[in-house]
Amino acid sequence: MLSLATLDLLLSISESELIEEMVVGLLASPQLAIFFEKFPRIKRALMKDIPGWKQNLQQRIREAKVPAGLANEFALYQQSQLEDSPLFYAHLPQIVVQLQQWHSPFATQAKTLLHTADLERNPQTGDSFQTLFLQRWRVSLTLQTITIHHQLLEQEREQLLAELQQRLALSGALEPILATNDGAAGRLWDMSQGHLQRGDYQLLLQYGDFLQQQPELQQLAEQLGRSRSAKAQPTPDARFEPYTVMVRQPDTVPEEVSGIHQSNDILRLLPTELVMLGMSELEFEFYRRLLERRLLTYRLQGDNWQEKTLQRPISLKSHDEQPRGPFIVCVDTSGSMGGFSEQCAKAFCLALLRIALEDNRRCYIMLFATEIIHYELSSASGIEQAIRFLSQHFRGGTDLAACLSSTLSKMEERDWYDADAVIISDFIAQRLPEELIRKIKIQQQAHQHRFHAVAMSAYGKPGIMRIFDHIWRFDTGLKSRLIRRWKR
């Protein structure tokens, strides 16, 4: 069957102009104009999608098929073009009858032209009438094809407008919460492609309002997200110079008792050794041990400061900003994290998502209790993932070791090699295995991974929290909440 794109080519119809006209008309619609005036960032993000729209419309036209009646009429038109004048005039009455049977829009005009020519009384010998007839026929075919284009593009326009209105409503509602610059607005626009209704993302708006009511929590998230500072790097041809530092080293300086050992130091003898001198039968044993340096004496030890010479570069010409990697956020969903702590933990993750969108970073959420649940909030379906995450309830146990093990495994993946781990918990948990602590230290020292702790309680175990590079404290207890409210 004849395709619409082929018919455009044969009739020299520019489909790109028709598509451009449709897109301009769509963007000029009153609904979009009002929205663009209110949210200019979303408008700039939407404009980047226009080339994709045009490609999709062109593909839709290529796939469209011409109706059978129009295809047959065009085939008859092509056949008539190839006929010489005598043969064309002989077939003309049949052509008019055929057009009438197909209910062609050109049938009435063709019949009028046939009666005007009156071929029976005035036989035509030239090709002027044939040229006029074919020109009028071609115009009719072009109009029919353009009409099909308009019908097809109008359907696509209505569908696209409905989709845009839904995405614009979602993006407009979430823009104050998640989009702080053009880059974040663009990523938010890309994430709004899912089929979400207003009731679906209402939970995001609620936690956005809660975050506004907790400025200290919002400030804490900003500090954590921006905490990676610039690092000075020596240039490859930098010259080095010696410099001297004082280094503390353990020495035998008599500062404090550090234990007992065998020696011949009479001044530091244990009382039990001195007893042998008062007994004649053990006196020779005492002298024997003295010569062999085997008398039990106190060991005194202290610190001795010595000079040490090191090398350092004379000039540091570059200060390379350390790249801000993605977030791997582990959220404790145990029963002790319920209530206000749960609200704060979810709002804190929402604040980290906003920072990730602003800095073009990825944000991965892991919920740990008796099992581990994963969400990637910065993916194409990030809004749907965020809604599912915010809908979770914290009623499980605490398995911090399993969560940290999963975090280490995630960091070994290529896309998460430079990630920062953020653990949100009250840290009322069991002691971590020594092997796990050793692996975390390797990641911190060898790969410069950073592990942050966001402590939601003042009663977290110090032994657990000692492994983290930085501890951000936000006590959710009633006393701390009242103090924060009083200071505002």
From Swiss-Prot:
SUPFAM superfamilies assigned to the protein according to its UniProt record, in alphabetical order: vWA-like
Leader peptide range in chain numbering: none
Assembly and binders: Homodimer. Interacts with RavA.
A single GO cellular-component term on record: cytosol
Subcellular location: Cytoplasm
Claim: Chaperone is one of the keywords in the record: yes
Name by which UniProt lists this protein: Regulatory protein ViaA
Domain of life: Bacteria
Swiss-Prot/TrEMBL keywords: Chaperone, Cytoplasm
Protein purpose: Component of the RavA-ViaA chaperone complex, which may act on the membrane to optimize the function of some of the respiratory chains. ViaA stimulates the ATPase activity of RavA.
Organism: Yersinia enterocolitica serotype O:8 / biotype 1B (strain NCTC 13174 / 8081)
Phylogenetic classification of the source organism: Bacteria, Pseudomonadati, Pseudomonadota, Gammaproteobacteria, Enterobacterales
NCBIfam families: PRK10997.1
Matches recorded under Pfam families: VWA_CoxE
Entry similarity comment: Belongs to the ViaA family.
